[in-house]
Amino acid sequence: MGISRDSIHKRRATGGKQKMWRKKRKYELGRQPANTKLSSNKTVRRIRVRGGNVKWRALRLDTGNFSWGSEAVTRKTRILDVAYNASNNELVRTQTLVKSAIVQVDAAPFKQGYLQHYGVDIGRKKKGEAVTTEEVKKSNHVQRKLEMRQEGRALDSHLEEQFSSGRLLACIASRPGQCGRADGYILEGKELEFYMKKLQKKKGKNAGAA
């Protein structure tokens, strides 16, 4: 028996059973879920779908393109861990990558980009003490440019804490089982606070259970 998306097997509105009055149709088929796992052994399958179109079914992934909205920067980075999923805790336990899953990504590419753009190495010292690196001698023109950029520079304190730990919380915005990629965005502001509270609550519950 294949997976079918028809309504013939459902009961009537009155609650009575309905007889199968025709066979299954190709256009009503369903496929097994991808359940994309977090793994370094990247596996993506090509699937021919209706109309001769193509879907890319990611079975194992560990990298993705993540954008940092407030800085208008996108970097390819490693996904390190699945931290939270609003729909199902089982998906966190099994490290499954789905749309809207909250994951921890490697902060290094963003750190590097920030250093290049502002000349500031974030996440080095304690909160609020960003260090300006003086290792490479810069020309006056470059120094003036960096100073101009620093005037409008603002960094969320929560984000700075995460940069010190080397892991950033991010949300997956693509559908790995449909397009074969796990792309998303770095959490900031109110959204970041919301998910940090959720994770803290979860940690507290686990500690209580233990």
Swiss-Prot record:
Region (Disordered): 1-22
Any Pfam family: Ribosomal_S8e
UniProt keyword terms in alphabetical order: Ribonucleoprotein, Ribosomal protein
InterPro entries per UniProt: Ribosomal_eS8, Ribosomal_eS8_CS, Ribosomal_protein_eS8_euk, Ribosomal_Se8/biogenesis_NSA2
Cellular component, GO annotation: cytosolic ribosome; cytosolic small ribosomal subunit
Gene3D superfamilies, per the entry: 3.10.290.70, Ribosomal protein S8e, subdomain (1.10.168.20)
GO biological process: translation
Basic residues: bias regions: 8-22
GO molecular function, a single term: structural constituent of ribosome
UniProt similarity note: Belongs to the eukaryotic ribosomal protein eS8 family.
Matching NCBIfam families: eS8 (TIGR00307)
Protein name (Swiss-Prot/TrEMBL): Small ribosomal subunit protein eS8y
Gene coding for it: RPS8B
